[in-house]
Every structure is written in C-alpha cells, then in structure tokens.
C-alpha cells in the first residue's frame, strides 16, 4: 500500500486513495475487489482495473483494503452513513475523485477474499426464474438493496437517477424487458 502511495504521490504530487487488491483464496489470479475505470458515466458502464505489477489509476474503488490519507479524511470526513451495506466505498472514492484526489489500485495483491459473487449473466438467469414476490425480497436484502442502489445513484450520478429508477422498476416487475434493454446498453 505504501509503495503505491509513493508512486501516486510521485505522479501527482498530492495525496491519493490507494485500494489494496484482494484475490480469491483458491485462485490468486482472480481479483475479487479493486478499482473500476468508467467507460460511460451516463450509461453506468465500466471495466475492472487489472493488476499489472504497478499501481493503476481508476475512477472508483472498493474499500475492502483502502488507504485514505489523513488530509483526505480532514477534507471529506468518513464514509456516508446512509447505506445499509453497499455503495459507501464507491460513493466515497468518487467524492474524493471529484475533489481532485487520484485513486489507484495496488500493482500486486494485498490480501485474500473468497470470490463469491455471481456474474451479471448468473444473476440475470436467477432473477428471470424468480417469482415477483421472490424478486421483491431479493431487492430488499441489504446486499442487493434498491434503497442503497438508488441512494448511491442520487448521490453519485443525479442525472442518471430517473432512468435508474425506471430500470430498477423494470428489473423487479418486467425482468425480461429490463434485460433486453440492458444488453443493448452493454453493446453501446
């Protein structure tokens, strides 16, 4: 973490947030968390930043392992407390970025974390098989919380908020239509 901090300071001559990259316990080549480079802010598309042996800049980052210099905390405070489970890390890192602080992931793994997340396709298949009642319960769960998701969008990308609200409504009530539209978005 500290060598990445020095790398970032040498590049920008200012404090940076450094996200330590955890890898899967059983597969050290599988990154479980890290940073994201945004491809299209309005559409909400991005790519996970990969470890290359040197720190990589990103647009938003997870906080499983996160080094935040004290001067950044003095300016931004700590994480927003309005979230149940998810999005506080993205929210904080994007707020830091907007204030001019660079974000980096480390060039090498800094820890282990089991990769237990579904791919987008796996989640799609699962949701399409669910009943309406099951989908509502799924999106009330803290890990998939509609409340957290919409709060995050409202705080990080307010121009997207009305579209994301419609998208979440479609994902719950008309998932087939939602995924058809989602695949078109992914191809843009």
Which residues does each PLM region occupy?
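A short, conserved alpha-helix in the catalytic core of glycosyltransferases
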Residues: 61, 66-77, 82-109
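Alpha-helical elements of Rossmann-like donor-binding domains used by nucleotide-donor carbohydrate transfer enzymes
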Residues: 3-7, 91-95, 148-151, 168
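Non-catalytic, C-terminal membrane-associated alpha-helical segments of glycosyltransferases
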Residues: 124-188
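Donor-binding/catalytic cores of nucleotide-activated saccharide
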Residues: 26-58
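Conserved donor NDP-sugar-binding/catalytic core segment of glycosyltransferases
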Residues: 1-36, 102
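Structured catalytic cores of enzymes that bind and process phosphorylated ligands/cofactors
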Residues: 2, 6, 18-23, 45, ...
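Active-site donor/metal-binding and catalytic loop motifs
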Residues: 102-130
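A recurrent flexible, glycine/aromatic-enriched loop bordering the glycosyltransferase active site
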Residues: 46-68, 134-137
């Amino acid at each position: 973490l500290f060598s990445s901090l020095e790398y970032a300071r040498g590049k920008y001559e200012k404090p940076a947030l450094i996200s330590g990259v955890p890898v899967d316990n059983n597969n050290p080549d599988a990154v479980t968390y890290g940073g994201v480079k945004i491809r299209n802010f309005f559409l909400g598309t991005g790519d996970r930043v990969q470890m290359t042996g040197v720190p990589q800049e990103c647009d938003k980052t997870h906080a499983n392992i996160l080094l935040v210099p004290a001067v950044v905390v003095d300016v931004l405070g700590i994480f927003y407390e309005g979230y149940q489970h998810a999005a506080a890390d993205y929210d904080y890192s994007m707020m830091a970025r907007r204030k001019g602080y660079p974000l980096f992931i480390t060039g090498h793994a800094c820890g282990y974390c089991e990769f237990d997340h579904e791919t987008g396709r796996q989640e799609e298949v699962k949701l399409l098989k669910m009943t309406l009642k099951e989908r509502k319960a799924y999106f009330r769960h803290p890990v998939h919380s509609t409340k957290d998701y919409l709060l995050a969008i409202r705080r990080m990308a307010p121009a997207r908020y009305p579209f994301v609200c419609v998208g979440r409504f479609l994902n719950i009530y008309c998932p087939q239509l939602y995924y058809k539209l989602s695949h078109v978005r992914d191809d843009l």
